[in-house]
Amino acid sequence: TAFSIANDIIRNAHNEAHGAYNGIALIKLMGRDSGFIAANAVLAIQEVNFVLIPEISFDLYGPGGFLAALKKRLEERHHAVVVVAEGAGQDLFESLTGEKDASGNIKHQDIGIFLKEKIKAEFKALGFPFSLKYIDPSYIIRSAPANANDSKFCNLLAQNAVHAAMAGKTDFVIGFWNNQFTLMPIAAVVAKRKKIDVEGELWWNVLEATGQPISMKNS
């Protein structure tokens, strides 16, 4: 459901970017530590040119950096759509406070506003014409009612949880592996955060969809 809603937002953003000379649409999506929403939304619409996720660091400046790649895209096609997960690019900030929210998560700096200002400053300094629109849908993408597929899946999770509890099982969550519902120990589930495998099929599919460089680092 979340990336279906994000898909509609990206589609509208693409229309906005395409309607202006050297138009840039910059969309920030949820994803504190993993870029799954951004990656899946991009694959669903196939209109995004750059995806920035927490799993992969990038440089802003220099011939191999993001701004140079964005400028090249605009010179060739005169519009660009950029999707950034909220946890991407945190290493670009000069100071990190380490402050935590009520849930104990480290508060990230706002990469969306940061990129918006850096893009504007760089292209203005170069005298390069552009039009930039920044979109932050925030919680909109996860506050929508679940679609039919997600509703069905959640009902099946609940049914399996009740069956397991009635059988005397405890300290578990319901998983889904190889088209089978499974019982996973809570300790195993929370031991490690799930992240995109940047050498795996999902990320390579994203690279093929966007056409962005494999790396946006200068070295």
Where are these regions (language model features)?
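Accessory alpha-helical/coil subdomains and C-terminal extensions
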Residues: 1-24, 28-130
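C-terminal non-catalytic interaction/assembly regions of soluble proteins
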Residues: 99-219
